A protein has these predicted regions:
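Phosphate-binding and adjacent anionic-ligand microenvironments
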Residues: 275-459
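Gly/Ser/Thr-rich active-site loops/lids in small-molecule metabolic enzymes
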Residues: 126, 204-206, 256-275, 340-349
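Glycine-rich phosphate-binding loop
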Residues: 100-112, 232-252, 256-257, 300-302, ...
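An N-terminal, well-structured beta->alpha segment
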Residues: 1-69, 73-74, 152-178
């Protein structure tokens, strides 16, 4: 019995479903064919073909095979590189001016799977492009042409090519001891080798690819990194990657998880000495990004939440750096796409120049009181509530703040800021607050929590 197509598997930046329930080989074949049809239009950048790679999940290889079948039926070429981290697949596409398709469900648990698309510059597809593919699949339009070919290339060759490229851009000064936790995910075939070839002393754990993720979940949440926390005490730092290797967690020798802003602060303290360009950060990122950018007289451009927005802005603005608070980063000096393996390597190289422990460096960084609160509300009403609050703030007569409404509503005060935005994935609204003092944080929390609760009660 054929699986009924569920359009909800298409999200803003990728495709995700439960294998055998909402996504299978037949659906993936249709997605591959629809991708090829979109590639025939003027709405998609012209590319010579599509690089196809996949993560370690048991369903990933058969889903990739189905995608390639649909793609080649549409008359397009596929370059198959097999099981690699996401970075290696996108790297192969960028080097060859191909689009890229990567079969993964990233940090989700093993029963999930899906696909991510990237253009020849390594920029992930936006919602508009993904939804066009969805609509072609939904209309059950299946294109059959001739001329689409497949070619296999060794994933080891791609990984070697990637490592040589990154090492040509940056190398460490001193050989720090680093613990690398790959979580039995896709990063295990690349990250430890990159660090070792650069001369770092590496203690790697959970490097064997295993789609059952037997040692920890593919999402590197702090509570799940017990082995890394145990080992990091005898090293300089620890690094953990998610299932496809596109997000990272960094940890100091005390077992403390670094925030994305702290990782960015380390990187920017060195990067902005040499690289021109602005810094891109989403509206949720803290003032720490502004502080380090100001030291180098650089502008910070705020963008909506979503790593695809980050990459698009970095590419269009020729930025020096991009950061997304969910743990995505971009350093075009290394590669022009979102890549946590290259990012973690660059950060380690910067730290290798310091005589201080990582915990000392972190403790010297500026830090401000910060809080995130979630308010449950009707999924159908959440965007309307945020819109009402936005209008209320805009109509404030004694306005002592600056408003940014590109994604929800952010109000910047002289000594703090708040952000109110509806969740894209659940029935809730998030209130994010940062202030220069606990007293100011408390005042902002009281004022805007009460405002939100009042608007939710009006539903």
């Amino acid at each position: 019995m054929l699986m009924k197509f569920d359009p909800s598997i298409f999200r803003a930046y990728d495709v995700r479903g439960i294998y055998g329930k909402t996504i299978d080989e037949e659906i993936m074949k249709k997605i591959g064919n629809a991708f090829g049809q979109l590639a025939d239009t003027a709405e998609m950048p012209e590319a010579s073909g599509c690089v196809v790679g996949w993560d370690v999940r048991g369903s990933s290889a058969p889903l990739a095979e189905a995608f390639v079948e649909g793609l080649t039926y549409s008359g397009h070429n596929a370059l198959i590189i097999g099981q690699t981290p996401l970075a290696a697949t996108v790297f192969a596409g960028w080097k060859r001016k191909f689009n890229s398709a990567y079969i993964t469900a990233s940090h989700l648990t093993k029963e999930w799977n899906g696909i991510k698309f990237f253009d020849e510059n390594g920029v992930g597809f936006m919602q508009e492009e993904n939804f066009k593919i969805r609509d072609i699949v939904g209309k059950n339009i299946y294109d059959k042409k001739s001329g689409g070919n497949t070619k296999n290339i060794s994933n080891k060759d791609i990984i070697t090519e990637y490592i040589e490229h990154v090492l040509s851009r940056v190398k460490p000064r001193n050989k720090l001891k680093i613990i690398i936790d790959c979580g039995n995910g896709a990063a295990g075939s690349l990250a430890p080798e990159l660090f070792k070839k650069a001369g770092f002393e590496v203690d790697d754990i959970f490097t064997e690819p295993d789609g059952d993720f037997p040692n920890r979940l593919p999402d590197p949440a702090e509570d799940d990194l017990t082995e890394l926390k145990k080992r990091v005490k005898n090293s300089y730092m620890g690094i953990a990657y998610d299932g496809d290797g596109d997000r990272l967690v960094a940890m100091d020798e005390k077992g403390r998880k670094l925030t994305p802003e702290q990782i960015s602060y380390i990187i920017l303290s060195e990067l902005l000495k040499k690289e021109k360009g602005i810094v891109v950060a989403n509206v949720e990122c803290t003032k720490m990004i502004d502080d380090i950018a100001k030291k180098f007289s650089r502008k910070v451009e705020r963008i909506p939440v979503g790593h695809t927005y980050m990459m698009q802005a970095v590419h269009e603005e020729k930025a020096a750096f991009g950061v997304e608070r969910s743990g995505h980063y971009s350093i075009p000096l290394l590669v022009p796409f979102d890549d946590s393996i290259a990012i973690s390597f660059y950060a380690a190289c910067v730290l290798s120049k310091s005589s201080k422990r990582l915990s000392e460096i972190v403790d010297e960084m500026p830090a401000y009181p910060f809080i995130r609160l979630n308010f449950e509300c009707d999924d159908r009403e959440k965007f309307k509530i945020v819109e009402r609050i936005k209008q209320k703030l805009k109509n404030e007569k004694s306005q002592n703040f600056k408003i940014n409404d590109m994604d929800g509503v952010r109000a910047d005060f002289e000594n703090g800021w708040i952000l109110i935005r509806a969740s894209n994935t659940g029935p809730s609204i998030r209130l994010t607050i940062e202030a220069e003092s606990e007293e100011k944080l408390g005042k902002l929390k009281k004022e805007f929590s009460e405002m939100l609760e009042e608007e939710i009660r009006k539903m």
